[in-house]
Regions:
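Extracellular and organelle-lumenal recognition/adhesion modules and their flexible linkers in secreted
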Residues: 1-132
Length: 132
């Protein structure tokens, strides 16, 4: 495992992967406020991708490249109202884009092992309640 290496992933802008239908999103002092009381549960609020086509997304990838077989500790720094209304999904893909495995994270941190067969991954922030 890599020791003392930290990569901070932040939500800095609205992208194609941000749920915007009826949403109010504001960015201030390094914090994001997302409000959408009518958003259905089970939909992604925002996604972070390791691989992106610049021509499609107009931005660089926001997740670091991970080493196969290595363990990583992920910490999610967020506040949600009501409590438990946000969770995260980590999805691993092989080289042809087929989903290998999925980790559902309902706490603030998790330790994962990057699969040996994985080529890419993404992280989705999901809505579990109607008020954030």
């Amino acid at each position: 495992m890599l020791k003392n290496k930290t990569f901070k992933v932040t939500w800095n802008y609205i992208s194609q992967t941000t749920f915007m239908y009826g949403s109010k999103v504001s960015f201030s002092n390094g914090e994001v406020t997302f409000i959408n009381p009518l958003m259905p549960s089970g939909l992604p609020i925002h996604e972070w991708l390791m691989l992106k086509q610049f021509s499609k997304y107009k931005s660089a990838p926001s997740l670091p490249i991970l080493r196969r077989g290595q363990h990583y500790k992920l910490h999610f720094d967020f506040d949600a109202t009501p409590a438990g209304s946000v969770y995260f999904i980590i999805i691993f893909y092989n080289k042809n884009g087929t989903k290998l495995s999925t980790e559902i994270v309902k706490s603030n941190s998790i330790t994962i092992q990057y699969p040996d067969e994985a080529y890419a991954y993404k992280i989705k922030m999901m809505n579990a309640a109607c008020l954030l």
